[in-house]
Design a protein with these regions (language model features):
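Short, well-formed alpha-helical segments that are part of the catalytic scaffolds
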Residues: 12-25
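Short beta-strand/loop segment that forms part of the nucleotide-sugar
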Residues: 28-38, 48-52
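Glycine-rich, basic loop-to-helix element that forms the pyrophosphate-binding segment
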Residues: 52-69
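Short aromatic/hydrophobic "clamp" motif used to bind/position activated sugar donors
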Residues: 74
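Conserved donor NDP-sugar-binding/catalytic core segment of glycosyltransferases
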Residues: 82-118
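Short, flexible, basic/aromatic active-site loop/helix in glycosyltransferases
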Residues: 123-161
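A short, conserved alpha-helix in the catalytic core of glycosyltransferases
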Residues: 153-155, 161-179, 184-212
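Active-site-adjacent helix/loop segment of glycosyltransferases
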Residues: 189-252
Length: 252
């Protein structure tokens, strides 16, 4: 089996109605992990649903999905991510021709077709403060170079990490080598962590613009400084620097 897709749902039945029909024909196996048992009632034929025995973190649910599937590649896709036709094939084809590509992500766009930057730099203390405090009001979204690569890619390009909250192809052998995702992250930063550990193990991270995914991420949560999402992100960053203290001294 070539590609297994894992979708973690926290009660996103409405989003799944749009994304699963687009995703299912592009993969060999599709598993929905329902973090809220019984919250996923209707799925396309051939899609498996596994109820989490108790509420777990996103990363822990991804690990459960990886363990319950068998594809050489695991596509982690969010309920609100809709791959365009041929997107998964483009990701897999690239990975097949680049044997050290451990993580391969698509070009992510908003529902209106505008670019959504998803290839990012590993975090620094300065960058986190710039992005997660009122300092971010000093610049327009995504125009800075502290956290993101600033131009829409036209060719495959390597980067530090790719936004796991949209759609991401991971090589199973890489996941086995680095120990999977870290389920200790409550929400946010787990995608940075898995990419960082992959990088330290010598695996490449690529964005392939021939693969396109529409992502309806609710950007409003990023605008409130003291929202629970901001606090979750800062908590995740604290865990990240405790695991990887060398990032405290990093300038980029």
């Amino acid at each position: 089996m070539k590609v297994s897709a894992v979708v973690v749902s926290h009660g996103h039945a409405r989003e799944l109605e749009a994304s699963l029909p687009a995703l299912a024909p592009q993969v060999d196996e599709l598993l929905v992990v329902a973090n809220v048992p019984g919250s996923v009632d209707t799925v396309p034929a051939g899609v498996r649903v596994v109820d989490s025995p108790r509420p777990r973190t996103f990363a822990a649910n991804v690990n459960a999905g990886v363990a319950a599937t068998s594809g050489a590649y695991v596509l982690v896709s969010n309920p609100d991510a809709i791959p365009e036709e041929g997107a998964v094939t483009a990701l897999v084809s690239f990975a097949e021709s680049h044997p050290r590509a451990g993580l391969v992500g698509p070009l992510v766009i908003w529902p209106n077709g505008t670019w959504q930057p998803s290839l990012r730099r590993f975090p620094t203390v300065a960058g986190t403060l710039w992005r997660r405090t009122p300092l971010r009001l000093l610049r327009a979204p995504y125009e800075h170079q502290v956290s993101h690569y600033g131009t829409r890619p036209q060719q495959p390009v390597q980067g530090d990490w790719l936004l796991g909250g949209a759609c991401l192809l991971l090589r199973r052998t890489m996941l086995e080598e680095i120990g999977g995702w870290d389920g200790g992250y409550r929400h946010y930063v787990e995608d940075i962590d898995v990419a960082y550990r992959a990088a330290r193990a010598g695996w490449e991270r690529w964005l392939v613009p021939d693969a396109v995914v529409r992502h309806a991420y609710a950007a409003v949560i990023d605008k409130r400084f003291l929202s629970r999402h901001t606090l979750w992100h800062l908590r995740g960053m604290l865990r990240f620097v405790r695991k990887h203290p060398e990032r405290l001294l990093a300038l980029r």
